[in-house]
Amino acid sequence: MADAKNDIVLSIRGMSKSFGRNRVLDHINLDVKRGTVMGLMGENGAGKSTMMKCLFGTYQKDEGKIFLNGKEISFSGPKDALENGIAMVHQELNQCLERNVTDNLFLGRYPTSSVGVVDEGNMKKKASELFRKLGMTVNLSQPMRNMSVSQRQMCEIAKAISYNSQVIVLDEPTSSLTVQEVDKLFEMMRMLRDQGISRCV
């Protein structure tokens, strides 16, 4: 039993969330094992996205507890969640379309040189290594506005992976992808599984 408990990276107990009189989540329980892919099934409006956003700190839950590696956690917002090992790719992409791929990858966390100046060379190197590792061919200098929705979504997934998170939450990740891109996404998921990273989709 102890080993089974240690294998659970994320646990939700009694999570509830209401918007006015509309109770969207009603005492939800969920366990996610380390290195697994978990799909959340349900009709539109069933509360899947709401649960994910409560987990990521976008919404604050009304009731319940969340545990990461057995430790109770409560995030004040998405930045707090990212710093503690949980990343999320939203169905509605949150990107700066006038900036290029590299800039979007490092928004809010630009690496700096020893004199405090943004280290663009280091950014490009890390971005290139990430996409090469994921088997993705991307023009790092291309503005996001010139990319298709599916290409932008794959870049956002790559960004979530770049945080070295223990859990990555994907909200309907295949909705804008082509058949070939879905295959690539599943390949990426298998790679993450082998690295012990868990996903909720």
What are these regions, as identified by a protein language model?
Residues 2-201:
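Glycine-rich phosphate-binding loops of nucleotide-dependent enzymes
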